[in-house]
């Protein structure tokens, strides 16, 4: 494959959905080593380019669903620290946020992640220890973002799911995420994982961490 063509495809990877990026990278590497005739390589390039364009379009289509600006309830300690937390997210792979009950961690952290640019290429996963918490928190965040449940914010628990392709934030129980790890060890569909109530130190939350 022509180096300029290869470079063009690699540059597009950072705009593709995270769940597609590794698969596309493997295809690019395979094409780079291919000894196929130029005509066949051109066909392969065209097909891969179309797949990548579709993945990019899906990621970019989420942008119009996200409120601009994202607002935070006044009076919550986490709201007052939103800019600081956003900066930490942008510069660290792992952060720990500690605060009193009612400080806004559960409902505001996913919004801060959205504000930091996450949730477009991959989901913001938000783990809760119980099914009721997952569904109620999803409804609350969706309400604050003025979005119907299942559109921008969705949830998945045992026997119940409200998720669409447009979702940026996914609430779930620890068990759901653990089951996904079995089929996707890298959790490639997620850009961010929030483990709430981590202080409970269940076996599942320890595995996630």
What residue ranges belong to the model's regions?
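Conserved Walker A/P-loop ATP-binding site and its immediately adjacent core
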Residues: 123-141
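Inter-Walker segment of RecA-like/P-loop motor cores
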Residues: 142-180
């Amino acid at each position: 494959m022509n180096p300029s063509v290869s470079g063009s495809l690699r540059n597009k990877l950072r705009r593709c959905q995270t769940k597609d990026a590794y698969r596309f990278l493997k295809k690019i590497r395979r094409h780079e080593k291919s000894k196929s005739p130029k005509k066949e390589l051109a066909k392969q390039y065209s097909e891969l380019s179309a797949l990548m364009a579709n993945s990019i379009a899906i990621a970019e289509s989420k942008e119009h669903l996200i409120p601009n600006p994202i607002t935070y309830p006044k009076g919550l300690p986490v709201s007052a620290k939103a800019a600081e937390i956003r900066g930490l997210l942008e510069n660290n792979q792992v952060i720990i946020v500690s605060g009193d009950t009612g400080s806004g961690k559960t409902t505001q952290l996913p919004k801060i992640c959205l504000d930091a640019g996450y949730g477009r290429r991959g989901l913001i996963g938000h783990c809760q220890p119980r099914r009721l918490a997952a569904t109620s928190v999803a409804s609350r965040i969706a309400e604050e973002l003025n979005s119907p449940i299942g559109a921008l914010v969705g949830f998945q628990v045992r026997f119940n799911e409200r998720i669409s392709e447009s979702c940026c934030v996914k609430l779930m129980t620890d068990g759901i995420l653990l089951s996904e790890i079995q089929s996707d060890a890298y959790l490639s569909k997620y850009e961010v994982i929030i483990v709430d109530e981590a202080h409970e130190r269940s076996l599942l939350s320890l595995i996630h961490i």
